[in-house]
């Protein structure tokens, strides 16, 4: 059969990695469905990739000592011939996104979090600015959402927080609640034509949540008729808007119950 290659990257750096469809179907998709993140493959020719501790502030200079060990989730940074050196007339954005090296090169901070597996493959776990600091630890969107997306009545899901985490923009900027004080909320867009009642679906989704350690803290499910998305590509969910909607929805429910 035909082999389809998929790439990972960004406007500032593309491609970063490559992965073939056979490997996805044979191996990595199963791990994704179990909450392991999305495998984006191995580095493209000429590209260097590292995973470093998550920081919100600029990193003044590069050191290999920043690199996290295999299997540990952190911020993805890349260096190579396709990496842009700066943002035009945006010195603060450049300072935040670029890590200078001694030889004048730069590492670009992708704004994504992920980890390397034992085979040297990079796994993506979501946007850095969308992580949620919950009572049990840090929740990353892709590993959490993927286990719920396996339900036949779910078109897609989005993990947000009504307390502010998960409502930051893609640069990671914005207000955060104190660590451990964020309340995760699972927003679900149902598959059209599904006949299961909301209450029954909620019970089944919460049963899935309890089946995995990393999702066991999720106890609130809300149903949205159609997620707000970027019209240029339907996959990018505007989580900031969804978090605001979720907060208002919960406030309304609490007022009705009181």
Predicted segments — roles?
Residues 47, 125-126, 142, 232, ...:
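Short linear motifs in exposed loops
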Residues 55-57, 163-166, 191, 225-229:
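Short, internal active-site loops enriched in acidic
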């Amino acid at each position: 059969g035909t082999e389809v290659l998929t790439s990972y990257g960004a406007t500032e750096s593309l491609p970063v990695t490559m992965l073939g469809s056979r490997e996805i179907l044979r191996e990595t998709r199963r791990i994704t469905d179990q909450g392991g993140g999305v495998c984006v493959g191995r580095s493209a020719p000429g590209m260097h990739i590292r995973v470093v501790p998550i920081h919100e502030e600029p990193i003044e200079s590069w050191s290999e000592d920043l690199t996290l060990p295999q299997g540990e989730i952190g911020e993805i940074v890349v260096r190579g011939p396709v990496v842009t050196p700066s943002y035009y007339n945006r010195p603060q954005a450049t300072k935040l996104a670029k890590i200078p090296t001694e030889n004048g090169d730069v590492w670009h901070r992708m704004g994504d979090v992920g980890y390397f597996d034992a085979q040297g493959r990079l796994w993506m776990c979501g946007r850095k600015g969308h992580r949620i600091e919950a009572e049990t630890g840090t929740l990353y969107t892709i590993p959490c959402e993927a286990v719920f997306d396996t339900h036949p009545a779910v078109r897609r899901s989005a993990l947000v927080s009504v307390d502010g985490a998960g409502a930051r923009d893609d640069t990671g900027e914005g207000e955060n609640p104190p660590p451990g004080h964020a309340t995760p909320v699972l927003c679900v867009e149902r598959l059209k034509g599904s006949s299961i009642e909301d209450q029954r679906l909620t019970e089944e989704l919460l049963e899935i949540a309890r089946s995995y350690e990393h999702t066991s803290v999720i106890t609130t499910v809300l149903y949205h008729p159609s997620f707000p998305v970027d019209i240029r590509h339907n996959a990018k969910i505007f989580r900031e808007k969804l978090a605001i909607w979720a907060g208002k929805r919960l406030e309304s429910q609490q007022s009705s119950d009181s």
